[in-house]
A protein has these predicted regions:
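Basic, amphipathic alpha-helical patches used to engage nucleic acids or provide basic targeting signals
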Residues: 125-145
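Interdomain/boundary linker segments immediately adjacent to catalytic/signaling cores
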Residues: 1-68
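Domain-level recognition of nuclease-like catalytic cores that cleave nucleotide substrates
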Residues: 152-198
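Active-site metal-binding core of divalent-cation-utilizing nuclease and nuclease-like domains
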Residues: 76-109
Length: 198
């Protein structure tokens, strides 16, 4: 049996890590099935997608909390194609970006647009290598449109990928992990972008 203090500590842990939101919003109806692996399944692609969705569920509340606490003039859009900005914000966007989907798009004052992409790698392989190159290209396309790019990534899969993570750190303006995002660096970057004169 857990003590009241242990229960409070578990509740705090679930809230701070985003697990509360994750379990409340997950697609399965039974946590026991999820934990025993029935819902998670053996399909690698589905598992990768699920880890990406889990990262969105962890990072989304961090972004919302920053915007609310600092009263930042950002509208937060989740899982939208850039075409959405043309249709709903009357922005001009290059055709190369129109059909690209973003984890998060923040639309700020004076059309300050920030694309935040998140991912988590639990294992090594070709995916971390591919993602670095694709996000370098994404940032370049965004910069051509006057937009900003933030990449939040984490996971043990990066441990054996030092060259790739170094490449990302050198070529991407705002690469973060969850620790830095939670400890104020994401907040600092979002405030800095609003003050940027571009």
């Amino acid at each position: 049996m857990l003590s009241n203090q242990e229960i409070e500590e578990l509740i705090t842990f679930f809230e701070r890590t985003g697990l509360t939101d994750y379990f409340q919003n997950m697609s399965c109806q039974n946590i026991q099935d999820y934990v025993t692996g029935v819902e998670v399944g053996l399909d690698t692609h589905a598992r990768k997608n699920r880890s990406g969705e889990a990262m969105e569920l962890v990072v989304g509340p961090i972004i919302q909390e920053i915007v609310k606490r600092r009263n930042l003039p950002y509208q937060i859009e989740n899982q939208k194609y850039f075409r959405y900005l043309v249709d709903h914000y009357d922005l001009e966007i290059s055709t190369s970006l129109l059909n690209r989907k973003a984890d998060f798009i923040l639309v700020g004052d004076k059309n300050k647009i920030v694309n935040i992409e998140v991912n988590f790698f639990s294992g090594t392989g070709s995916k971390p290598q591919e993602i670095v190159d694709s996000y370098i290209n994404r940032q370049n396309e965004l910069l051509e449109n006057g937009f900003y790019f933030i990449w939040i990534t984490d996971g043990f899969g990066w441990k054996g990928q030092k060259n790739q993570i170094r490449k990302g750190l050198e070529m991407i303006d705002y690469p973060l992990n969850l620790h830095f995002a939670r400890k104020g660096l994401l907040e600092k970057i979002l405030c800095q972008i609003l003050q940027d004169s571009n």
